[in-house]
């Protein structure tokens, strides 16, 4: 890991009363600070993923016997990952200690820390950023202290949006470090499963929810993934007006 102290690297940006960047744009790494044994060996022997659990364990044992150099490399990578994990969990990234830390969770906080007051953040995040326990603290902070200009979800079917895992659902986020007003709303679009759906959808008005509504959806400030049809949005709004069946179930919706 190559450390960077932003005030030292960009003194002209962080000196003065209004410190920080006016705009932050990024696509942070989506990976855990952890090296999985089977994932490591799958990179060197792609056929592992098609094997049963027992077959995979036997093949890995065979590979470990044949390739002591890779066994050493895996051990070294795990040590580095453990150190990185400790840095993340002990850093200024509230909530990241829930489970194995994801790098994107730390980057979310870093974006917020380096952008100026009233500055804008435009980033690409995995769906988990809007629902996982590890991202709850950031969601809560952003909803209560920021202004979401737009959140658009896309399903990366056939890799139409990004050359990456086609099963991913991705959030395109536009957020300002500006306190929400009394009547502030959060605009949500999608999910769009193709370029055609996306181009048609962004021409329409987004679904808008008040900050108060977002706070009341779940106890962990999770964002819903709804069908883009108007009827689905309307039905969701009616369901949210009903008393909760249970407020004690983690991530439970107000239905």
Where are these regions (language model features)?
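Polynucleotide-recognition surfaces of large bacterial nucleic-acid defense/processing enzymes
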Residues: 1-23, 28-94, 114-116, 149-152, ...
């Amino acid at each position: 890991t190559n450390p960077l102290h932003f005030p030292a690297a960009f003194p002209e940006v962080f000196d003065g009363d209004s410190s920080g960047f006016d705009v932050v744009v990024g696509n942070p790494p989506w990976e855990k600070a952890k090296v999985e044994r089977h994932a490591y060996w799958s990179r060197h022997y792609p056929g592992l993923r098609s094997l049963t659990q027992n077959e995979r364990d036997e093949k890995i044992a065979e590979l470990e016997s044949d390739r002591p150099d890779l066994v050493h490399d895996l051990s070294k990578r795990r040590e580095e990952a453990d150190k990185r994990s400790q840095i993340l969990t002990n850093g200024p990234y509230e909530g990241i200690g829930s489970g194995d830390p994801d790098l994107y969770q730390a980057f979310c906080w870093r974006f917020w820390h380096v952008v100026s007051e009233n500055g804008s953040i435009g980033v690409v995040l995995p769906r988990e950023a809007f629902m996982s326990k590890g991202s709850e603290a950031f969601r809560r902070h952003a909803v209560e202290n920021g202004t979401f200009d737009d959140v658009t979800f896309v399903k990366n079917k056939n890799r139409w949006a990004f050359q990456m895992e086609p099963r991913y659902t991705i959030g395109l986020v536009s957020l300002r470090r500006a306190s929400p007003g009394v009547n502030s709303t959060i605009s949500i679009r999608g999910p769009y499963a193709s370029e055609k759906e996306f181009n048609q959808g962004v021409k329409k008005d987004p679904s808008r929810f008040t900050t108060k509504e977002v706070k009341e959806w779940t106890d962990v400030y999770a964002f819903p993934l709804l069908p883009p049809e108007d009827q689905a949005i309307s039905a969701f709004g009616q369901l949210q007006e009903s008393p909760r069946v249970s407020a004690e179930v983690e991530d439970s919706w107000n239905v």
